Amino acid sequence: DGGKLVVVDIGANDGTLLKYYPKNFFRIGIEPIKKFAKECSKYADVVVNDFFNYKSFNESLGNKKEDIVTAISCFYDLEKPNEFVSDVKKIMNENGIFIIQQNYVVKMLTQNAFDNIVHEHLEYYSLISLQNLLARHGLEVFDIELRELNGGSFRTYICYKGIRPVSNSVYE
């Protein structure tokens, strides 16, 4: 990576998010669907054509520590969220940021957005349930953005516990 900031997009799809990072970032896409992985390679320096887990990541890229890890619209599809979070922590450097964007169950319920509940999403999270999951792994939400997308969603910014100041948005 030559001293560049390193970003990993898990569930990178066609690389849309990665294309917006500056060229001075080392961009890694994790995408299990072969057709999308091929598209993603236009914007990623490296594409791992597999589901994310520490073992496959380490085999492909070695024991790298990443600056930014994103999981956009895929966190609610996980069969083993504890294992996933544990594996993300293993690839993050101590000052790294993990960003999750997903449907927000509280907004969905208050807006009666039941049409956004779909069979492939295995779980939906509130901030408290996500914080409890992250705390088991020594991670915490340090900032949050509520969004209107998909009947209500939230983007959470996560770090190693105690590394960054926690924004007032987390307490509101």
What are these regions (language model features)?
Residues 67-70:
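A conserved beta-strand element that flanks and buttresses the S-adenosyl-L-methionine
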Residues 82-97:
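A short glycine-rich, Lys/Arg-flanked "PGG" loop and its adjoining helix->strand segment in the class I
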Residues 3-13:
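Conserved class I S-adenosyl-L-methionine
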Residues 100-123, 127-129, 134:
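Short, glycine-/aromatic-enriched active-site segment of Class I SAM-dependent methyltransferases
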Residues 43-57:
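Conserved SAM-binding strand-loop segment of SAM-dependent methyltransferases
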Residues 150-172:
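Flexible, glycine-/basic-rich loop-and-beta segments that form/coincide
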Residues 26-31:
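Conserved SAM-binding motif I beta-strand of class I
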Residues 14-24:
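Conserved SAM-binding loop of SAM-dependent methyltransferases across substrates and taxa
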